[in-house]
């Protein structure tokens, strides 16, 4: 159906102002350079020389961070030299040369472009918000799909402004440049690039007239984001080599918080709040239910969601709304214990709700479910049963489900664009696009993931450890792809790393194994990056292993890898012969561990979720 479009005059005038006022963006539209497919450059710190492995059940030992010296200015660089680290060197030189007092320090180049990014992102966000309001105020002027896509763009543009403000503040106030800070900055800048592309993809899919009006300015702004990412990432990592990186530490808490092992917290809450018993105990009482031994989690408060009079809330949404805003890691987790039951509510953890822990009674006991999908007019970005944006979110013993079915195509169970988020003993159930690992750094441990087409997809830096990945039976003539990573830029620190997992057929596909072909993944975007390491791969996976997305597009620039997998589907003799496909050696594989890929050893200890920083010992 052909869409009706609004009069774009006012929006175009404002967009033209952006386009003209941003002289640094007016340049020839240069395509990204096409580098050879190579292993990722060395990350902030290498695994210990004496042993490349950590024991499977033990995280690294954490010590108080050393205090590196403040960073002296880097050696001067010309714009031409600095811009070699970006995908758009010609446009980059135009940007830096446009400033009369052009800074010569690479770090200042990056900070200058971030300032420009924030200025233009704020303007673009206002344009999108204004247009969204006009669409909503004129019923019938746009389709439901277009309204949804524009709303997504508004949300994503606001997130990008927030990320850029955070980066600006952190770079301005940092006394020392730790490895953890560098990785956090890189993650947020990578997220900005991803947000922009998600907006554009959604507008195009909705056949929105607004896409044509906003496409050129957004394209230029995307290039600016990409240039800033390249400059900042390169400059910070150069400076980082001046001292040894510090490891993470366990943060202390204030008088209103307490520490206890995660398992003790879980058992204590379930025991104390059994059935309809009074759960209105103080945080201190809950904290004294068990003895602390080894790791622990810092808790500020615990609330209960359930049907009993003694429970604090009847919906998870209300419990989230009651959580404090913008808390810090040292403030502790706000714990939401959702009793066994089916929660038919569409839940969003917004960006201001940080340090939330959602705890259930176990897989298939505490269930969050919905059925929104693309066929019924929802966008892929906004059709999830559960969405999380707030930093440091963690979930334990919960099932996230989308019941739309394969005939409804994209139907997301959980969308995650939360920095430093983690999921432990959770289940994600759907068909196409089950788990949307949208952006930023994520960790999944001992989880079950069910789906058909692209059922782990997005552009996060996501690590899966000890998970079960089940391919379901798709619709006729469909092919299963376990992963579809969306890395857009060679400087993004994103990818999917699957370690010590089990890949096999779900019961419906196991009953008819020849009804559909299953592949490890396909490249959603040109720099897609995915590795399978030390995992069991059943014979459900085709001998070629991987599937192209659109002909040969991206096959030379992606980075797909396998390392030390086993099982009947792990034989690599007949694997694809793409330039971007790699059989990894140990050194290359170590780049995709918790220790190196997401620097999880600097933030996962706060969750007390078990993890290993390296690879499994071969002993």
UniProtKB/Swiss-Prot annotation:
Chain positions covered by the region annotation Disordered: 31-84
Region (Pectinesterase inhibitor 25): 73-231
Annotated InterPro entries: Invertase/methylesterase_inhib, Pectin_lyas_fold, Pectin_lyase_fold/virulence, Pectinesterase_Asp_AS, Pectinesterase_cat, Pectinesterase_inhib_dom
Name of the protein this chain belongs to: Probable pectinesterase/pectinesterase inhibitor 25
Biological pathway: Glycan metabolism; pectin degradation; 2-dehydro-3-deoxy-D-gluconate from pectin: step 1/5
Tissue: Expressed in siliques.
Region (Pectinesterase 25): 302-601
GO cellular component, one term: extracellular region
Residue stretches of biased makeup (Pro residues): 37-72
Compartment annotation: Secreted, Cell wall
Active site: 433, 454
Glycosylation sites: 220, 255, 312, 325, 364, 382, 500, 550, 591, 596
Record's miscellaneous remark: The PMEI region may act as an autoinhibitory domain and prevent untimely PME activity during transport.
GO biological process, alphabetically ordered: cell wall modification; pectin catabolic process
Organism: Arabidopsis thaliana
MF-aspect GO terms: enzyme inhibitor activity; pectinesterase activity
């Amino acid at each position: 159906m052909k869409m009706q479009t609004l009069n774009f005059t006012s929006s175009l005038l404002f967009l033209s102002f952006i386009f003209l006022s941003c002289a640094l963006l007016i340049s020839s539209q240069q395509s990204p350079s096409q580098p050879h497919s190579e292993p990722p450059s060395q990350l902030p710190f290498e695994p210990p020389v004496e042993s490349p492995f950590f024991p499977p059940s033990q995280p690294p030992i954490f010590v108080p961070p050393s205090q590196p010296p403040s960073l002296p200015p880097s050696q001067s660089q010309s714009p031409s030299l600095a811009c070699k680290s970006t995908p758009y060197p010609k446009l980059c030189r135009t940007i830096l040369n446009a400033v009369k007092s052009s800074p010569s320090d690479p770090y200042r180049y990056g900070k200058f472009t971030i300032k420009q990014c924030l200025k233009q992102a704020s303007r673009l966000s206002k344009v999108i918000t204004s247009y969204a309001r006009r669409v909503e105020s004129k019923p019938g002027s746009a389709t439901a799909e277009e309204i949804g896509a524009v709303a997504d763009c508004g949300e994503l543009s606001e997130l990008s402004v927030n990320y850029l403000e955070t980066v600006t503040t952190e770079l301005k106030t940092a006394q020392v440049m730790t490895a953890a800070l560098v990785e956090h900055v890189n993650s947020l800048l990578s997220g900005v690039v991803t947000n922009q592309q998600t907006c554009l993809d959604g507008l195009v899919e909705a056949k929105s007239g607004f896409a044509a009006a906003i496409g050129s300015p957004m394209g230029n702004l995307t290039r600016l984001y990409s240039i800033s990412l390249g400059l900042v990432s390169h400059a910070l990592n150069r400076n980082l080599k001046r001292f040894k990186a510090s490891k993470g530490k366990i943060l202390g808490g204030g008088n209103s918080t307490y520490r206890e092992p995660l398992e003790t917290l879980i058992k204590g809450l379930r025991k104390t709040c059994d059935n309809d018993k009074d759960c209105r105990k103080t945080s201190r009482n809950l904290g004294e239910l068990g003895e602390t031994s080894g790791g622990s989690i810092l808790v500020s408060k615990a609330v209960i969601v359930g049907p009993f009079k003694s429970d604090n809330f009847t919906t998870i949404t209300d419990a989230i709304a009651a959580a404090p805003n913008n808390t810090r890691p040292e403030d502790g987790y706000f714990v939401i214990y959702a009793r066994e039951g089916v929660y038919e509510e569409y839940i969003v953890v917004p960006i201001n709700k940080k340090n939330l822990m959602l705890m259930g009674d176990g897989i298939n006991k505490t269930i969050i479910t919905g059925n929104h999908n693309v066929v019924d007019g929802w966008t892929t970005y906004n059709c999830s049963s559960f969405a999380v944006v707030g930093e440091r979110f963690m979930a334990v013993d919960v099932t996230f489900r989308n019941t739309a079915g394969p005939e409804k195509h994209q139907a997301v169970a959980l969308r995650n664009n939360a920095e430093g988020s983690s999921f432990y003993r959770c289940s994600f159930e759907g068909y196409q696009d089950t788990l949307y690992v949208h952006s930023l750094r994520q960790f999944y441990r001992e989880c079950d993931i069910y789906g058909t087409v692209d059922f782990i997809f997005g552009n996060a830096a996501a690590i899966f450890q000890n998970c079960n990945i089940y391919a379901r039976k798709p619709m006729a003539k469909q092919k299963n792809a376990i992963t579809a990573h969306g890395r857009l830029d060679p400087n993004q620190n994103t990818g999917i790393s699957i370690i010590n997992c089990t890949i096999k057929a779900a019961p419906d596909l196991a009953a008819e194994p020849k009804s559909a072909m299953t592949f490890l993944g396909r490249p959603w975007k040109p720099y897609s990056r995915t590795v399978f390491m030390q995992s069991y791969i059943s014979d459900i996976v085709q001998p070629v292993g991987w599937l192209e997305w659109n002909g040969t597009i991206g096959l030379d620039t992606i980075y797909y890898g396998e390392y030390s997998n086993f099982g009947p589907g792990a034989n690599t003799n007949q694997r694809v012969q793409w330039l971007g496909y790699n059989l990894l050696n140990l050194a290359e594989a170590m780049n995709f561990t918790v220790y190196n890929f997401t620097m999880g050893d600097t933030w996962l200890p706060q969750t007390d979720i078990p993890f290993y920083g390296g690879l499994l010992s071969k002993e």
